[in-house]
């Protein structure tokens, strides 16, 4: 991205009218607060977990700019399945790409990246302490101006059509009790140009290929937010 392109992008995300996230964002928060079983499907991804009674927090520009996510957290031992992330990430100064995690009873039991060196570094981080192999956050991103990963998590976790799944420390206001020095937001984009994917709440399809498909959440889709 050129300097001029970044300037335009930065001004767009900073001057966006964040009040447009309401009421769709509040509806998503309510759905997450009331949900039990989450099922996420996509390219080399099939995850199941529960967020029952964990709570959910809406982030609509009050504390961060850019913003645009609602987060919760899986019950610690409820995560099963696997996920292939498709957004690059930097953690502790190291660049990672192609991270794939496999879960059993909430714990990451297999973790690889796109090279032997990256896989070794990834597992060193996940072995930092007893909580680093458990998930501390699940969040859905919907900022219409943030569309491509740029290796800056303040931006990348808000990518429209994405979600992130976070090994390590949970937040107090959506807590599953997991404690760790690690909090590593890993992003998967589910738009068609990134392989698509689906998110289900209690067997109801909520989002398909990055677009919300239930009436009360459609206001969070880019074509609605950018009107």
Feature names for model-found ranges:
Residues 43-44, 53, 103-105, 201-204:
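Short acidic-glycine loop/turn motifs at beta-strand connectors
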Residues 182-227:
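Extended hydrophobic packing segments that form well-structured cores
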Residues 1-80, 215-216, 220-222, 226-227:
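Active-site bordering "gate/hinge" segments
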Residues 75-127:
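Long, well-ordered mid-to-C-terminal structural blocks that present hydrophobic/aromatic surfaces
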Residues 110-179:
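Dual-mode signal for accessory low-complexity, basic/Gly-rich regions
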Residues 80, 96-98, 105, 133-137, ...:
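Active-site lining segments that contact anionic ligands and/or coordinate catalytic metals
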Residues 25, 34-36, 67-70, 84-89, ...:
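Glycine-rich, charged/polar anion/phosphate-binding loops
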Residues 54-56, 88-91, 107-108, 114-116, ...:
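Short, glycine-/Ser/Thr-/acidic-enriched flexible segments
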């Amino acid at each position: 991205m050129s300097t001029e392109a970044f300037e335009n992008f930065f001004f767009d995300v900073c001057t966006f009218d964040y009040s447009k996230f309401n009421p769709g964002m509040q509806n998503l928060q309510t759905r997450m607060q009331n949900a039990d079983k989450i099922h996420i499907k996509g390219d080399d991804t099939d995850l199941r977990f529960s967020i029952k009674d964990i709570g959910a927090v809406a982030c609509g520009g009050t504390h961060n700019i850019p913003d645009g996510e609602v987060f919760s957290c899986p019950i610690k031992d409820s995560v099963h399945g696997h996920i292939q992330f498709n957004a690059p990430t930097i953690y502790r100064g190291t660049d990672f790409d192609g991270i794939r995690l496999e879960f059993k009873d909430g714990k990451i039991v297999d973790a690889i990246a796109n090279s032997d060196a990256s896989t070794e570094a990834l597992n060193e981080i996940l072995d930092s302490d007893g909580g680093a192999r458990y998930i501390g956050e699940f969040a859905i991103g919907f900022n219409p101006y943030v569309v491509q990963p740029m290796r800056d998590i303040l931006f990348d976790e808000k990518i429209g059509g994405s979600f992130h799944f976070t090994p390590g420390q949970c937040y107090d206001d959506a807590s599953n009790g997991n404690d760790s020095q690690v909090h590593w937001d890993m992003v998967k984009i589910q738009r068609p140009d990134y392989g698509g994917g689906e998110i289900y709440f209690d067997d109801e399809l909520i989002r398909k290929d990055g677009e919300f498909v239930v009436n009360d959440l459609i206001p969070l889709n880019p074509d609605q937010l950018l009107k």
